[in-house]
UniProtKB/Swiss-Prot annotation:
This is Urease accessory protein UreE. Residues 171-180, 194-210 have a biased composition (Basic and acidic residues). Involved in urease metallocenter assembly. Binds nickel. Probably functions as a nickel donor during metallocenter assembly. One of its GO terms (biological process) is protein folding. It is found in: Cytoplasm.
Amino acid sequence: MLKIDKVLSAPHGIAAVLVRRAPKLVLPFGERSKSRLRAVLDNGDEAALFLPRGTVLRGGDLLIAEDGSFVEVQAAAERVLEVRAADQHGLMRAAYHLGNRHTPVEVGRDYLRLEFDPVLADMLARLRVQAVQIDAPFEPEAGAYGGGHKHGHDATFAEDYAAAQAVFHEHHGHDHDHGHSHSHSHSHSHSHSHSHDHDHDHDHEHDVKGHVHGPGCGHKH
């Protein structure tokens, strides 16, 4: 059994003749997202992968076995939804709603691809875009803050989430602090700007400009 613990991401610069001669590891996206895997190559040999956690293999990547031999990765055809629209706006709307659902999406020049899901297929139909079930290789976008395909239960998800939060606070932290300070300053000033004889145990959140003084208001004038 070949033991594989190294990967050269495409484009890797290895001579084309060596790549052509190398056995192929043909896997769907879900299997290519595993750092520990046993698989059978196209020549019948068995291989055991021990790759760094978080590694996602892409079609064209080259694996290096312990004996120095090469294995080329190929993306297997799998059942996916291919989304097309009459214009770019329709495709952008579809991408937006899929992103809100944290769905892995492959972004092409004029199409989107995602793993087949009948619920998402129904949503896309409601968005008035064309979603057709086909068999094709699936190469979704990598995470913006990490190297691959992440879910909430993955070991590296927390790291990616922390990185995303840090970037958010770096760009928005000042504005947030300013708004918070302003809110408390206004509340303090408002609470001391009036003299009332009635009990303050009730929730005092009425707007100043909306408060009308008149008979029965409970204030002494």
